[in-house]
Curated annotation (Swiss-Prot):
Classification via InterPro entries: PyrdxlP-dep_de-COase (IPR002129), PyrdxlP-dep_Trfase (IPR015424), PyrdxlP-dep_Trfase_major (IPR015421), Pyridoxal-P_BS (IPR021115)
Catalytic activity: L-glutamate + H(+) = 4-aminobutanoate + CO2
Modified residues (N6-(pyridoxal phosphate)lysine): 396
Cofactor(s) it depends on: pyridoxal 5'-phosphate
Organism superkingdom: Eukaryota
Chief subcellular location: cytoplasm
Gene encoding the protein: GAD2
UniProt subcellular location: Cytoplasm, Cytosol; Cytoplasmic vesicle; Presynaptic cell membrane; Golgi apparatus membrane
Organism the protein comes from: Canis lupus familiaris
Subunit structure, as described in the record: Homodimer.
Lipid-substituted positions (S-palmitoyl cysteine): 30, 45
Protein name (record): Glutamate decarboxylase 2
One of the protein's GO biological processes: gamma-aminobutyrate shunt
Length: 585
């Protein structure tokens, strides 16, 4: 595939300074938006800048330059003095908005009011005095509001109320005290990119319908492969609807690499295939095996040590057992950042075993891949460059708005051979441009959402160094939490030693249990503590943190930090809140 030129398409220098002669990122977007959004793109740019860009001249390969501007509305005043208050939404319906005749003014007013609702929500998300969640039980919400779909349309006043109600009861995942999931935080540039992506409303299967986005996917995936350590960023990749699908892509491609005939003839034409992954790995490996007809029984779970890392000797033992039974080992999936412990499998040792037995090595770095952006922490993924494929979710540790997951493959062209179906109504071979940019045939999907723009725009805004600071801060906050609770009365660590990732796993032991002997009764009572505290957190709306059992360990808290808005004070608050809510248990 030919490489796009430097400048607008590139990420700029590592320090985030970029090329001074290039337009700013947002302005650059507005310069090209008209190519695939038409008037709507110009209107949104007008909302951003108070003016609108004229359509760029056709022809030429250079990104269009800024042109003369026109007013966004009839009044031509800043701020706009159009009589917005005269719009009575009670008498307007969706049919009164664009493309309706004379629909421009109500459309602008309606979208501005929606924007006001969104911006109020954004501001509240960072206000520590607001609740993380206004929790109601499902039956309460069902009874309080009529959520049913009707045959007749509702007016726009009711539609705006639905927008407000939906956000009122939504989780504020950007709140600095929301620690419940691996994906937290709310990045303003990423949010803006998501809005613009939805406005463009295009598909990713061919260059002709997504020219900018296809190029951005190319340069972004190439950059990610360079960071992994593949020479010159060589290889292939795709953005998929989450890490589970990325992992399934890896299984699909690994199977095709070993037995290409399976594409036409199916599983009946190949011997029984066996995949290997750690007992702490993500459940998506088994889901992928089920979906691909390999079967969950063909996924062998490898023992982990006390820190949750795969034991290489057990991996080799299980590979030999499978071969002795006449089965064919085809994939080993190592994990870089397990979901619960945040453990990193020993990738170099796993790579040696995969090379020895000629097995595809996949690294599920959905959670831990972000650490590759940090010079301080990337050593934890040493050996990832030897993998055949890597899953990396920027929507987790890097804070990109959901969804943004990439599957990176070391061998170029393999994904295309595995998945292409040559649909002639999409992938005509006599088009007038370089067909290597028609990337849709290597995807399982036909309709594919534009996920790259959020990551690309954030990268332009933050630079690699900005992501590094983000990662380092979150890891430092996890170390801060660990340093406080490791010797604090009422806390017990699930495993010894400083966490490798931002996962901090611990039990809170209420005063009533501290005097009990470490026996079955104590464990039974301790198992009920975390669920009760979590329920109280949600009912008060003060904070949220996850809990779970694992193996023979009863329910414990799993604290994860991926939101750079969090501070030491938020960690202190969490500790105090756990103690307040659990003191009487």
């Amino acid at each position: 595939m030919a490489s796009p030129g430097s400048g607008f398409w590139s990420f700029g220098s590592e320090d985030g300074s970029g090329d001074p002669e290039n337009p700013s990122t947002a302005r650059a977007w507005c310069q090209v938006a008209q190519k695939f959004t038409g008037g709507i793109g110009n209107k949104l740019c007008a909302l951003l800048y108070g003016d609108a860009e004229k359509p760029a001249e056709s022809g030429g390969s250079e990104p269009p330059r800024a042109t003369s501007r026109k007013a966004a509305c009839a009044c031509n005043q800043k701020p706009c003095s159009c009589p917005k208050a005269e719009v009575n939404y009670a008498f307007l319906h969706a049919t009164d908005l664009l493309p309706a005749c004379d629909g421009e003014r109500p459309t602008l007013a309606f979208l501005q009011d929606v924007m006001d609702i969104l911006l109020q929500y954004v501001v509240k998300s960072f206000d520590r005095s607001t609740k993380v969640i206004d929790f109601h039980y499902p039956n309460e919400l069902l009874q309080e509001y009529n959520w049913e779909l009707a045959d007749q349309p509702q007016n726009l006043e009711e539609i705006l109320m639905h927008c407000q109600t939906t956000l009122k009861y939504a989780i504020k995942t950007g709140h600095p005290r929301y620690f419940n999931q691996l994906s937290t935080g709310l990045d303003m540039v990423g949010l803006a990119a998501d809005w613009l992506t939805s406005t463009a409303n295009t598909n990713m299967f061919t260059y002709e319908i997504a020219p900018v986005f296809v190029l951005l996917e190319y340069v972004t995936l190439k950059k990610m492969r360079e960071i992994i350590g593949w020479p010159g960023g060589s290889g292939d990749g795709i953005f998929s609807p989450g890490g589970a699908i990325s992992n399934m892509y890896a299984m699909l491609i690994a199977r095709f690499k070993m037995f290409p005939e399976v594409k036409e003839k199916g599983m009946a034409a190949v011997p029984r295939l066996i995949a290997f992954t750690s007992e702490h790995s993500h459940f998506s490996l088994k889901k992928g095996a089920a979906a691909l007809g390999i079967g969950t029984d063909s996924v062998i779970l490898i023992k982990c040590d006390e820190r949750g890392k795969m034991v290489p000797s057990d991996l080799e033992r299980r590979i030999l057992e499978a071969k002795q039974k006449g089965f064919v080992p085809f994939l080993v999936s190592a994990t870089a950042g397990t979901t619960v412990y945040g453990a990193f499998d020993p990738l170099l040792a796993v790579a040696d075993i995969c090379k020895k037995y000629k097995i595809w090595m996949h690294v599920d770095a959905a959670w831990g891949g972000g650490l590759l952006m940090s010079r301080k922490h990337k050593w934890k993924l040493s050996g990832v460059e030897r993998a055949n494929s890597v899953t990396w979710n920027p929507h987790k540790m890097m804070g990109v708005p959901l969804q943004c997951s990439a599957l990176l493959v070391r061998e170029e062209g393999l994904m295309q051979s595995c998945n292409q179906m040559h649909a002639s109504y999409l992938f005509q071979q006599d088009k007038h441009y370089d067909l290597s940019y028609d990337t849709g045939d290597k995807a399982l999907q036909c309709g594919r959402h534009v996920d790259v723009f959020k990551l690309w725009l954030m990268w332009r805004a933050k630079g690699t160094t900005g992501f590094e600071a983000h990662i380092d801060k979150c890891l430092e906050l996890a170390e801060y939490l660990y340093s406080i609770i490791k010797n604090r009365e009422g806390y017990e660590m699930v495993f010894d030693g400083k966490p490798q990732h931002t996962n901090v796993c611990f039990w809170y032991v209420p005063p009533s249990l501290r005097v009990l002997e470490d026996n079955e009764e104590r464990m039974n009572r301790l198992s009920k503590v975390a669920p009760v505290i979590k329920a109280r957190m949600m009912e008060y709306g003060t904070t949220m943190v996850s809990y779970q059992p694992l193996g023979d360990k009863v329910n414990f808290f799993r604290m994860v930090i991926s939101n750079p808005a969090a501070t030491h004070q938020d960690i202190d608050f969490l500790i105090e809140e756990i103690e307040r809510l659990g003191q009487d248990l």
